[in-house]
Amino acid sequence: MDSAPSGLTLTVIILSIILLAFISTVVSAYETAITSLTPYRWKNYIKTNNKQDKLSTKIINHFQNHYSSCLITILITNNIVAIMVSNILFLALEQTIKNELLSSVLNLVVSGVLIVSFCEILPKTLGRINVIRTLVLFAYLVYFFYLIFWPITKLTSLILKKYENPLPVSRKDVYYFIDEIEQNGLFSKEDSLLIKKTLIFDQVLVKKVMIKWKKVAYCYLNDSINLIAKQFLQRQFSRMPVVDKTTNKIVGFIHLKDFFTAKEANPKSLDLNQLLYPVVLVQDSTPIKQALRQMRLNRAHLAVVNDKHEKTIGIVSMEDIIEELVGEIYDEHDDIQPIQVLDENVWLVLPNVKAAYFFNKWIKPDLVKSKNITIQHYLASLDNDSFACQNKLDTPLFSVEVIADSEDKTKILYEIRKKSDVIA
């Protein structure tokens, strides 16, 4: 029967286990860190901290470019460490404890708790929390094992190379990423919505944002000056299409400023042809990004929209295109509507609008039972004190902020925002 290990042997065993446990801890943390590292985050760190020439930076760059080899190195190291710890403990316990069953159980429990809990679960959690710090701090040690196991990792990488095709980043991936940033509080709902709209900006077609021809205010080339002036004054548009009555084609646009300047200078012999701006033609199937570029190149604020049969079906302005990104734009000449849609989940609402009409249509069906109560009285009934003092109200379904009219402070509007997780 073997005698119990001597003090020196016991010291060597303990130190060996501590060293192996440390190695396992490092590579486990490194595995999570290298997996969690994103290229943009790493590049930002290098640029911000001026670490381009550091050896650790070059090592981490190499690991990113040879991710499979790095991961194989970590897995091999971890498995070897686990086997060595288990064998060392088995030999030590076998010499110390006479009962083989008890020795095996203690070996399993000690090595299992030590390796799984303290050398894998805990370091992996810390590696995910401190990604860059972990990578930089232990780059040299992991690279040491990378060199030791290079023949194995190289051979394995060559075998796996034909199966290793990195998946391209899709729009859906970017959407998930934006949603995650929004949930972490770095983006507001409006910011994330704007970015998402920017991503699909080149997919939106002109026919979605154009003004249909039946809603367009226009004049004929042979209309009287007074009639055209009346059109401008009534419609409050800065530009107007001019149509040739003979061909029924748009021959150009006139600008309000040019028209009234010429009218004042020479009202009797004003020639409309001299005021015309050339027509920019776009197809209804044209992406708005391309239409915007075409309008900018031609320095045109408006474009005529034709269908595939070259029939004029509407017009589109730069404002229409920009509103697709930022939401509805109202200027000082627009009439104040009872309900102004600023975005798909944001509205400006007058106090006298019926609460049932607005909330049941846009927030949630059957939210308001009474058909006669106004929004002003409905909101006041929800929370009198805080709403009256702070001019703000927050509910599980929506939030409200009181907006004073810029010209008349006694007039107010309610900015109502629907919560993103509410389904109408």
Swiss-Prot record:
Cell location: Cell membrane
Membrane topology reported for the UniProt record: Multi-pass membrane protein
Keyword Transmembrane helix: yes
Keywords, alphabetical: CBS domain, Cell membrane, Membrane, Repeat, Transmembrane, Transmembrane helix
Xref: InterPro entries: CBS_dom, CBS_dom_sf, CNNM, Ion_transp-like_CBS
SMART domains with a match to the protein in the record: CBS
Stretches assigned to the CBS domain: 210-270, 272-332
Transmembrane domains' residue ranges: 7-27, 71-91, 101-121, 135-155
The keyword Ubl conjugation is assigned to this record: no
Cysteine pairs bridged by disulfides in the record: none
Pfam family, one: CNNM
Major location (coarse): membrane
Protein name according to UniProt: UPF0053 protein MG146
